Amino acid sequence: MKILILGTAHPYRGGLAAYNERLAFQFVSEGNDTEIFTFTLQYPGFLFPGKTQYTDTESPAKLKITRIVNSVNPFNWIRTGRRIRKLKPDILLIKYWNPLMAPCFGTIARIAKKNKAANTKVICIFDNVIPHEKSIIDRLLTRYFTEGIDGAIVMSRSVGDDLKAFRVCVAPSAVIEA
């Protein structure tokens, strides 16, 4: 099976990157052709709440990680979606954590799945559907994103409950040991 993960990975640091990389390793260990498309720009520097977005560790060996996504450039989203469409993955897996990523991820997903020959399925792993400090724009952005996916995996029951408002097919995630 050909699986493309869209989201945070090396050289970015943190739990999102670690999760995506570990998931990719698991898919590879099961014999799947797996690649991660990560960011050239995840957040503009002035929006990043921490000291740095980047890790100083080596890139994970034996993982294909391509830095291609600019989260704030709509022209890049179109190019990235077209590139994914040409790759014809069986599954495009997106890790979603913030509605600010909805325009980027939603546009890429819609373009990528237009490939009828591959019949790419877009599956999302939701950490959060709506942030704790929610606003009306969060619901609009999340609706845009969820209308472009085929199914979802949620990380908690409360996230699954939040997602029901968007009429998405949900499967709960299994417990993952560290």
Where are these regions (language model features)?
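A short, glycine/small-residue-rich beta-strand->loop->alpha-helix junction that serves as a flexible
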Residues: 7-21, 44-45, 97-102, 133
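Histidine-centered beta-alpha loop that forms part of the nucleotide-sugar donor binding/catalytic region
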Residues: 8, 95-98, 126-129, 172-178
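N-terminal strand-loop element at the rim of the active site
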Residues: 10-13, 25-84, 159
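Short beta-strand->alpha-helix junction loop in the catalytic core
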Residues: 42, 159, 170-178
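Short N-terminal targeting/anchoring amphipathic segment
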Residues: 66-70, 79-104, 120-125
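Nucleotide-sugar donor phosphate/pyrophosphate-binding loop at the beta->alpha transition
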Residues: 121-123, 128-148
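A short, active-site helix/loop in glycosyltransferases that binds the activated sugar's phosphate group
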Residues: 147-170
